A protein has these predicted regions:
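Short, Lys/Arg- and Gly-enriched loop/turn segments at beta-strand edges
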Residues: 508-514
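Short, charged, surface-exposed secondary-structure boundary motifs
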Residues: 146, 256-260, 264, 396-400, ...
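Acidic (Asp/Glu)-rich catalytic clusters
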Residues: 236-240, 272-280, 358, 379-381
């Protein structure tokens, strides 16, 4: 039976015109337009349901264009340090939490930033807080700070540094407490998986899905898929229908052994052949993810010019090796998603994708925080999707940037308008759990360049890069769908596409987005979330 959704403001891609009505049948949109159209009159002569949208705004279901599902679910159970300002705050927060959780085998924390501890992270700073292992994930997920008990549990004392990572040590070779980049991914992440039961992992993912549905998301793009998470997803899918679509990118770890890296890509190719748009559109392997550099806050993002403190890190991959791995994936029709934050890493990523360029491949670059004007223009020319996370441009977390990279470079960071004006498709994501998963928070910062974390902070980051509300919403819906080849059936309210949409109480004003409220989430024509109205 068809359902007429009427008396709403249905977003069709422009902030100047909205449809007033849609018709949905068998989970698909059959009509978008005015209520007075002959199609509506004809429909009313037969059997139909009618839903009054009460004048609310209806957007396509949000699609988080860059996120980490298992990590988000796990983080919801971890101690947040995001409100801490100093080492003293961190110590007090952990100590108080530990007292209230005596049965936990280890204390897991998240949200630490280097600026909170003057760039330092030693086990000795937190060893006296508790005898149990304490592991603190950095806000950007590129570092894990451990106490001595955690280092012992991880067994890293005699391990060699993995390619692209570092186990920090003192002058005597003793581990000091910090795991950087791939060292965190190779040692800490698998350990968390190994000490968690399947039921705990399933619970974490289900909690993440529930959290996403409550903020209007009907699709997600997972950017660090591995064997552990994939296994859990397959078990969950076998037990129930899930209210979302997931496109995943297999994380490729750097290695001095090229065969090992090729074998990782081959595993992604194998899974892609089995789980793709045709065979498994709601949970599939879309491509590979390669992390080309680190982050600005830790001075590990690869820049064309050194940091103000003299640090000058290399990219995590050589151009030659990156090109070979990308070419291998591209030849098997895998999309390539390249994490690149610093302008040197961004140039290398663009150069690499240019070398394998063919129209329609939809390769993508993640973050693009320090793109040069020249490389910003190249994205559109080469059909590269600009995968952006406006929540990372929140001025409340960028206080250290002028000191690290200078005012000039800091003032033109996150140049999203240049990507858009250059013709690149924008795909908006949160990078959760490194940032809030709520799309409205993301949209607020994208359209105001002001802080959603600290409303008293009146700073504006690179005001010229502000996106219009319609552009930002399109990036969070249609653009994100396009980025993973899902735009043929979702991402916009168009005839023939699935009825995935979110109903909001909201004013069409960037400055009021934080007051907006998700009222309902619909997936394939079924209501999967609702609040009491």
């Amino acid at each position: 039976m068809a359902t007429i959704y009427r008396n709403g403001r249905f977003f069709t891609g422009s902030d100047k015109s909205f449809a007033k009505c849609i018709i949905v049948q068998d989970g698909l949109i059959q009509y978008v337009g005015d209520e007075s159209h002959p199609t509506i009159e004809k429909m009313k002569k037969g059997n139909f349901n009618e839903v009054d949208m009460l004048g609310r705004t209806i957007l396509p279901g949000f699609i988080d264009g860059h996120m980490h599902l298992m990590l988000l679910g796990s983080s919801l159970k971890q101690l947040s340090l995001e409100k801490c300002k100093s080492l003293e705050d961190i110590r007090a927060t952990i100590k108080a939490y530990a007292v209230t959780k005596p049965s936990l085998p280890r204390i897991l924390c998240r949200g630490w930033m280097h600026s909170m501890t003057n760039g330092e992270a030693f086990a000795s700073m937190i060893d006296d807080l508790d005898d149990r292992p304490i592991l603190i994930d950095s806000k950007d997920l590129h570092f894990t700070w451990c106490n001595s008990a955690a280092l012992q549990e991880l067994g890293v004392e005699d391990k060699e540094d993995p390619a692209g990572g570092k186990i920090h040590r003192d002058e005597n070779g003793k581990t000091t407490g910090l795991l950087s980049e791939t060292a965190a991914q190779v040692f800490a992440w698998p350990h968390f998986a190994n000490v968690s039961s399947m039921d705990q992992k399933l619970e974490a993912i289900e909690e993440a899905i529930t959290a996403y549905t409550a903020v209007g998301c009907t699709g997600m793009v997972e950017m660090a898929m591995d064997e552990n998470v994939w296994e859990v997803l397959q078990v969950l899918q076998s037990r129930k229908d899930l209210p979302f679509r997931l496109a995943a990118y297999w994380l490729i770890q750097p290695s001095p052994n090229e065969e090992k890296m090729i074998s990782q890509v081959d595993r992604a190719i194998e899974l892609h052949r089995k789980y793709n748009l045709t065979t498994s559109p709601n949970c599939r392997i879309a491509g590979i993810k390669i992390i080309c550099d680190g982050v600005v806050d830790a001075c590990t993002a690869a820049l064309q010019e050194p940091y103000c403190n003299g640090k000058d890190p290399e990219s995590l991959w050589t151009p030659d090796m990156l090109r070979r791995i990308v070419k291998h994936a591209d030849s098997s029709d895998l999309q390539c998603a390249l994490h690149a934050i610093g302008d040197r890493a961004i140039k290398m990523a663009v150069d690499t994708l240019e070398a394998v360029y063919k129209p329609g491949k939809r390769h993508r670059i993640e973050h693009l925080e320090m793109a040069s004007p020249t490389d910003a223009k190249r994205l559109g020319q080469l059909g590269i999707t600009a995968s952006i996370q406006p929540v990372h441009s929140d001025p409340a977390i960028l206080g250290a940037w002028p000191k690290l990279i200078g005012n000039h470079r800091a003032s033109r960071a996150f140049p999203y308008n240049e990507f858009h004006e250059g013709g690149a498709v924008l795909a908006l994501g949160s990078d959760s759990p490194t940032a809030p998963h709520d799309p409205l928070v993301n949209l607020y910062t994208a359209t105001t360049r002001r802080s959603a974390r600290d409303l008293e902070n009146k700073s504006v980051v690179n005001e010229a890069a502000i996106l219009s509300l319609a552009t930002a919403i399109s990036a969070a819906t249609k653009g994100a769908a396009y980025s993973c080849f899902a735009d043929a059936y979702t991402g916009s309210l168009e005839v023939g596409k699935t009825a995935d949409f979110v109903v909001l109480d909201m004013e069409w004003s960037p400055g009021n987005l934080l007051e907006a409220r998700v009222v309902q989430t619909w997936f394939e024509g079924q209501k999967v979330y609702a609040v009491d109205c």
